Amino acid sequence: MRALLDTSVVVAGTSITVDSAAVSVITIAELGYGIGHQPDPFERSRRSLCLSRIQELYEPLPVDVIVADAWAQLAAYTAACGRQPRRRAFDLLIAATAQAHGLTLLTRDEDLLWLSDVLDVRAV
């Protein structure tokens, strides 16, 4: 299986066995935000090391026009299902990245599993 690791999987340090794995540039942004807003210097340092390790292990997949188109479709689907796409914009961008690249989205975020009707998303 070729997979995209959701931020929740990266943060948890979940051990995953897949043929190949990737992360989204959105995950890099979310991790950086978490570092910048962490008041505890020890936790900030731990998170910085985690981010450095992720950047060494993976070449983040960018948000490009194909991902943007996939996001627009997922956001419209989300709204049609009565959910708020803007509240989950980063999650939907990560999901769109998986969809655009034909990857399985691996997540620990149960709120993403409802996308399984339109995306290969699996809980880990």
Describe each PLM feature range.
Residues 2-3, 13-96, 114-124:
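PIN-domain endoribonuclease scaffold, especially VapC-family toxins
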Residues 7-14, 108-111:
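Short, polar loop motifs at secondary-structure junctions
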Residues 100-106, 110-113:
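C-terminal structural segments of small proteins and small subunits
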